[in-house]
Structure formats: structure tokens, C-alpha cells
């Protein structure tokens, strides 16, 4: 019983210390599909997404998701990603960038910029279901530390406003802000550029039939039915 309770507490702590896992993966996947086609061929989107949840899932890191502690982790894993990419080790480059993205994007989350926030509200804020819409940008990031520091600006006010209004536009805005930083960091890390062509896979409703095929199927069934009747009658006549 004690072990089960401990496991439950660990899972709860992890969820309270970052955007939920689908959001982390959605952000890094969005980056991938907005890089140029050459870079997409080199990188592994599955490993990017896996890396994006490793700080929670594998490291069980529940203390370095906010600035300034998020900066060293982001820098370490970005450097590892860049080094691996330059060595043409594209799988580790993908994984490491995914890890870096986790620390970067969490820095933008309002609950990570306040203290003693109610756990229930923290979880609700970061469980927002949203597909980020920020567009790819190739601005040069000169100072990651400064960029992450700026990411914290206005976040306490965001939190207070959200607590009072539960306005979903606030966490959505912060996810887009984090994506706006991820784009240029990915471009610099992988010596890439923004993709002018859209290659992202979208879910398209699929019909297993159309009008013509349905009519054809009905005709076939009708012919088979008539054929069966004819054969039965033929057998009776022989008898």
C-alpha cells in the first residue's frame, strides 16, 4: 500500500511540474514540421517527442522547470544536440533537443513563476488542450539566458489573471510564446531554416465507400441472390 501511494505521489509531482506530456510533444512536433525538408529527413520526430518528456518520465526532475534553474539544463542539452548533429548522430541530436525543449517551454508557464500555487490549479492550467499556432521565425538568439529571463516577464500577472478568470487564452498564449523561442533555437542547432512547404501530417476523415462503390456492391449482392435462387430451382427440377 505504501509503495502504491509513493508511486501515485511521484506521478502527481511530475504532472505538477511541467506542461502535460501531450503539450510538450505537440510543441516539439510543431517545430519539426516547420523545419526545412532536409532537416526533417535527418531528424527523428519520434525521438524528438520522446525526449520532450524525458525530464519527467526518466529523470524524475521536479525542481528545474523554472528560471533560473531551467537555463543550465536547456543549455546543456542544446549543446549536446548540436554536437551530435555535427557528428551526424541524428538520433541523439533529436533526443537531446527534445529534452532541451522541455526545460525551455516550462520556463514560459505561469505556474512556474509563482510560489505556493494550489496544486489543483497548477495542474488545470497546464492541462490545456491546444495546438500551438506560432509561425516559424529565423531570428538570431544571441543569449539563451536572457531569452529565458524575458520568458518570465509578466507571468505572475498572467497567473493572477488566470486564477480569477480561468481564461484559456492565457496558457495558449504562453505555449505560443515558448514555440516562438523553440523555432530559432532549432534552426541554429541544426543549421536549418523555416520550411516554406507544409509537410505536417494531418488527420483526414476517411470513408470506406463512396456512392458509386455502394451501388456496385448492391448490384453484386443482387446478382448473387438471383443466382442462388436460380440454382435452388434448378436442383428442384432435377429432383
Indicate residue ranges for each PLM-predicted region.
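Intrinsically disordered, low-complexity sequence elements enriched in Ser/Thr/Gly/Pro
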Residues: 1-2, 229
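Sec-dependent signal peptide recognition
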Residues: 2-11
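N-terminal, motif-rich segments that launch catalysis or mediate targeting to/interaction with membranes
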Residues: 12-95, 113-207, 218-222
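Short alpha-helix carrying the canonical HExxH Zn2+-binding catalytic motif
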Residues: 93-101, 105
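Selective detector of the "anchor" transmembrane alpha-helix that sits immediately C-terminal
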Residues: 207-231
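Cytoplasmic C-terminal tails of single-pass
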Residues: 234-239
Amino acid at each position: 500500500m505504501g509503495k502504491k501511494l509513493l508511486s501515485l505521489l511521484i506521478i502527481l509531482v511530475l504532472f505538477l511540474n511541467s506542461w502535460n506530456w501531450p503539450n510538450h510533444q505537440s510543441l516539439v512536433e510543431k517545430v519539426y514540421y516547420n523545419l526545412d525538408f532536409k532537416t526533417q529527413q535527418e531528424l527523428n520526430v519520434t525521438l524528438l517527442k520522446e525526449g520532450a518528456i524525458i525530464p519527467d518520465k526518466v529523470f524524475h526532475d521536479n525542481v528545474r522547470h523554472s528560471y533560473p534553474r531551467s537555463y543550465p539544463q536547456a543549455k546543456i542539452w542544446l549543446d549536446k544536440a548540436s554536437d551530435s548533429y555535427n557528428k551526424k548522430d541524428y538520433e541523439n541530436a533529436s533526443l537531446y533537443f527534445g529534452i532541451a525543449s522541455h526545460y525551455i517551454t516550462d520556463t514560459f508557464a505561469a505556474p512556474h513563476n509563482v510560489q505556493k500555487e494550489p496544486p489543483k490549479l497548477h495542474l488545470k492550467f497546464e492541462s490545456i488542450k491546444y495546438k500551438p499556432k506560432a509561425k516559424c521565425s529565423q531570428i538570431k538568439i544571441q543569449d539563451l539566458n536572457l531569452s529565458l529571463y524575458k520568458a518570465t516577464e509578466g507571468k505572475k500577472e498572467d497567473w493572477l489573471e488566470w486564477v480569477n478568470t480561468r481564461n484559456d487564452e492565457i496558457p495558449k498564449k504562453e505555449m505560443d510564446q515558448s514555440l516562438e523561442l523553440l523555432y530559432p533555437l532549432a534552426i541554429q542547432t541544426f543549421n536549418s531554416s523555416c520550411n516554406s512547404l507544409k509537410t505536417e501530417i494531418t488527420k483526414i476523415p476517411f470513408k470506406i465507400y463512396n456512392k458509386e462503390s455502394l451501388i456496385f456492391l448492391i448490384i453484386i449482392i443482387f446478382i448473387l441472390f438471383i443466382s442462388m435462387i436460380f440454382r435452388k430451382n434448378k436442383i428442384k427440377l432435377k429432383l
